[in-house]
């Protein structure tokens, strides 16, 4: 597989520390993604991709992708509308287990054309991993190559590094774009506003929240309305849903 394997914990720690320093120095998401080439090659792969999906707005969530995939594949992917039925993204939305791309003889009928086109464009063997963070952002990181099948024995050696890289890529790139894609994730909610939304999310009425937090119903309504405004929500229900999906509740303490 042509991968770099570390013989000691100290070597692995130094390697990861260097990656962290390099990525943390990147000025934007595009630069951070381009820099991954130097990290991916030692793992034995030619191609890599990262797709970020937000959890809000629920009916029109944002999706942004970066890749160094062959131009032929990017053109085919767009022309055939594979974004709507991508089996990699569909699998990765259902969980966070790594996905080893299927071999030609193990592809389901519904996905046959997708994988045939991918292989024809040089993406013959690959692996994908999804990471989900506290803001409800999903990030799917993929590694691929045109030759040499990825064996189970090889994965035992290198997959821990691949999983760690997926987590690092997600943390780095999502942090660089979150202010643009999810400005409400940084909504300056006060602790009392979080607590009122927290108990509202549990189905409590204003009167019940007031009793729990030992304040007047008027104050509860006041704090909820402030939270609605800060989250750019349409109403109380919308604010609770957004706060939950963005990891702003439950309130701690």
Question: Each predicted region: which residue ranges?
Answer:
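Juxtadomain coupling helices with adjacent low-complexity linkers
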Residues: 2-22, 29, 141, 145-190
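Helix-loop-beta substructure at the N-terminus of cytosolic sensory domains
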Residues: 26-61
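GAF sensory/regulatory domain recognition
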Residues: 52-76
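Regulatory sensory and allosteric helical modules in signal-transduction proteins
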Residues: 67-110, 116-119
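Helix-to-coil/beta transition segments that act as allosteric "coupling" elements at the rims
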Residues: 112-136
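The N-cap/first-turn positions of alpha helices
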Residues: 192-196
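Recognition helix of helix-turn-helix DNA-binding domains
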Residues: 205-238
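Basic, Lys/Arg-enriched C-terminal extension of HTH/homeodomain DNA-binding domains
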Residues: 229-253
């Amino acid at each position: 597989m042509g991968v770099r394997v570390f013989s000691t914990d100290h070597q692995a720690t130094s390697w990861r520390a260097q990656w962290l320093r390099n990525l943390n120095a990147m000025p934007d998401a595009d630069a951070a993604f381009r820099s991954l080439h130097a990290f991916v090659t030692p793992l034995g792969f030619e191609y890599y991709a990262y797709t970020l999906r937000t959890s809000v707005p629920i009916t029109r969530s944002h999706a942004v992708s970066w890749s160094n995939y062959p131009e032929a594949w990017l053109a085919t992917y767009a022309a055939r509308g594979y974004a709507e039925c991508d089996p990699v993204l569909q699998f990765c939305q259902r969980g966070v287990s790594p996905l080893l791309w299927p071999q030609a003889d193990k592809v389901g009928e519904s996905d046959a054309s997708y994988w045939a086109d991918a292989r024809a464009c040089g993406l013959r063997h690959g692996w994908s991993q999804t990471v989900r963070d506290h803001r409800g952002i999903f990030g799917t990181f993929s590694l691929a190559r045109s030759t040499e099948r990825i064996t189970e024995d090889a994965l035992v050696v290198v997959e821990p590094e691949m999983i760690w890289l997926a987590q690092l890529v997600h943390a780095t790139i999502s942090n660089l774009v979150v202010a643009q894609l999810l400005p409400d994730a940084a909504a300056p909610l006060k602790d009392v506003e979080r607590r009122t939304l927290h108990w509202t999310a549990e189905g409590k009425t204003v009167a019940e929240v007031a009793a729990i937090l030992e304040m007047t119903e008027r104050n509860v309504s006041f704090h909820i309305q402030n939270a609605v405004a800060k989250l750019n929500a349409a109403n109380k229900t919308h604010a609770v849903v957004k706060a939950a999906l963005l990891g702003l509740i439950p309130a701690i303490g």
